UniProtKB/Swiss-Prot annotation:
Substrate binds at residue 112. It comes from Geobacillus sp. (strain WCH70). Belongs to the tRNA pseudouridine synthase TruA family. The gene is truA. One of its GO terms (biological process) is tRNA pseudouridine synthesis. NCBIfam families: hisT_truA (TIGR00071). This is tRNA pseudouridine synthase A. Pfam families: PseudoU_synth_1. Keywords: Isomerase, tRNA processing. GO terms for molecular function: RNA binding; tRNA pseudouridine(38-40) synthase activity. Formation of pseudouridine at positions 38, 39 and 40 in the anticodon stem and loop of transfer RNAs. It catalyses: uridine(38/39/40) in tRNA = pseudouridine(38/39/40) in tRNA. The active site is at 54 (nucleophile).
């Protein structure tokens, strides 16, 4: 009998062309399905994720599901997958899920984090894991601006022109930031995120911190529903899909 398996995984997005499978490109989904096909003796197994991540974007807590006829315990699945996956993907947790569980459609909220290193000199070892930003920032102004991001808004100004969904209203439950030595970490929890939304919000908030735009410009951007009213898109390497929230 077929079983539905739910996995939580981490990956370093540096050497992937994103999560979603692309012909001739190295992707997270491609690596997962390659290993599962080997385990199923050549039978193709389709993997479904909570959402896609772009090239260079990392995941601390991505969630996937797939269906299988193999009779392995969750612990056996975890060991078998980790033994065959490349070292930039790690399966952290495996559970047998209810057949109705869906990694994407059962998700109630997602948490993204974005890391910015505020220092004059670049760190060669951190260059793929945070955004190097050598400018002084007004932290108080940025916190005020972040509070305006919280709540239910139309995020048309804060998503890529490539966004292919018509309903761009999302609810952000938490938009916060904290300093850890020279590392500034943004945290966003919401019921859904549009294409490049977190990276555009971060780029905009950094412009507030640098004095390039006012705190009020956040409200104006929401009203305008026009990408040109928000700031630059922050680069991919600072972004992490941190956690996916489900009812259970």
């Amino acid at each position: 009998m077929s079983k539905r398996i739910k996995c939580t995984l981490s990956y370093d997005g540096t050497h992937f062309f994103g999560y979603q499978i692309q012909p001739g490109k190295r992707t997270v989904q491609g690596e997962l399905e390659r290993v599962l096909e080997q385990m199923h003796k050549g039978k193709a197994i389709r993997v479904t994720a909570s959402g896609r991540t772009d090239a260079g974007v990392h995941a601390y807590g991505q969630v996937i599901h797939f269906d299988t006829f193999l009779s392995l315990s969750p612990d056996q699945w975890k060991k078998a997958l980790n033994a065959q996956l490349p070292d930039d993907i790690v399966i952290k947790d495996v559970q047998e899920a209810d057949p109705s569980f869906h990694a994407r459609f059962s998700a109630k909220a997602k948490e993204y984090r974005y890391k910015v290193r505020i220092a004059q000199e670049r760190d060669v070892f951190l260059r793929n894991y945070c955004y190097h930003y050598p400018y002084p920032l007004d932290m108080e102004a940025m916190r005020h601006a972040l509070r305006l991001i919280e709540g239910t808004h139309d995020f048309t100004s804060f998503c890529s022109a490539k966004t292919d969904v018509d309903d761009r209203v999302r609810t952000i439950y938490k938009a916060d930031m904290a300093m850890h030595d020279d590392l500034l970490e943004f945290c966003f929890i919401g019921n859904g995120f549009l294409y490049n939304m977190v990276r555009i919000i971060v780029g905009t908030i950094l412009e507030v911190g640098q004095g390039k735009r006012s705190i009020d410009s956040i409200s104006h951007a929401f009203e305008a529903k026009d990408r040109q009213f928000a700031g630059k898109t922050a680069p991919p390497q600072g972004l992490y899909l941190w956690k996916v929230y489900y009812d259970n």
